[in-house]
Amino acid sequence: MKERQRQWFIFVENRQAVIEALTRGECDGLLPAARSFLDGFAGFLLNHGIMAVFEAFPEQRARQSIPVVFFCGSLLYRPLFQLPSLQAVGDVLFRSPYILRQMGFNAVQIGQGFYRTNGRKPFDEEAVAEFFAPADADTFLAHQEQVLHQLYQEFPWLFRQGVWAMDSVSFSTPKGNHGLPEGRYKVCILGVCYQDTVLPLLWLFAPEEAHDLPLGQRLVERVEAALGQGVIKNLLVDRALLDGAWLTLLWHHGTHVTVSLRENMDVLSDMLGLARLGETEWMEVPPPDNHRDPAPQREITGFTDLTSWEACQAPLCGCLIRDHYPDHTEYQGVVMTAEAGDAKTIYERHTQRWDHEELLMSLTRYWHFDRLPPCRVGVAYALVHFALLAFTLLNLYQGEGDHTAIRNQGPPPLPLPEREIAVYAGPYFTLLRPSELMEIIFTYWDVWADHRDAILDALKRFEGSP
């Protein structure tokens, strides 16, 4: 027997229309109206103009009967509900009609014989896939630029933090049915350091074999074009983004870059030579958390006016890190494009880059952003795109009030049903308290008497009973 296909239909909130239907003995379904942190989060998105940005997502549909915001919202909430795939979105979608009310519409699963009328617009997980499948890396970059500009308007204090970090992470999709090949990709993420984590603000997708440097250069160019040169006051990058000419350009734009040196670089050799001079002073700092037993004794020393990196014409200050182990000593070098900078400042800036490493670990371990189902390229990009966006937006929401911290953790727990019931009638829904619903039924019992079994069935569905 062919498995029945699940479909979703869009509903508009209309309290008067639903109550009028109830007075006629008509009710198409009941769902629990869960309230939790997600309710406040929905209001946060609305109040800060994020939903308006979702409405502007670039699309290529010939028919546009379903609002764009519904496609974007579905994937934004997917990681918050810890749903592993689009099929799971179809199975669960939103448990809080309040959230959807904030967005201006609602949705409920259509069961066989559960709805009597036609004319509503079908929406299912396949529709989500078809919407995002044509999108490419530039589509998501353009959309996130719009989000970035909105965040800049709404949260100017975030950008005054001044310390940004950038790194890349790989993800993949397994081979699927009907000849769908596996996919291997990477995303270069540029974010701002905020409360012991990094909030992703702009990112660019690419095939896994793409080099990090052109991806990173393009991201910085887009931020400068959107927000102005110098908005990135301090940038922390990985060695994969080492390029003297680029660092010089950023210096002229007002951006100080901090980066680790490769072992074969002349500037590192110069710092090692200068460190042998008798007047060199070393400062002890806490040992690194590098899971080595015993942990090393770590010391740092600093240098200014470093000139042996010919490709970099920006002024350079350096920090040499020395780790003493029982049987050997290890060195590593870090430089910052600045006219002045002591070892402690450079070292502390360097250690902030590990916040970016923690971010990538959290997105993998707790948010499972890279645990993707077999899907087309555009869909894979969309799943990761909205997971990154959900992490940033939820952190900003949490920062506005006394909410449970989610930094470097998983999403908060799923909401549980509370006092209100989402009541559906025709193409409309509203939220009613149980007493309000029962009062209407008892008042108009003459029309409800013939629908006793239907209302009991609806209540059982509400309870989750078979």
Residue positions per predicted region:
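Short, conserved catalytic/metal-binding motifs centered on acidic residues
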Residues: 74, 89-90, 124-131, 160-171, ...
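Active-site-proximal, Lys/Arg-enriched surface segment
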Residues: 121-195
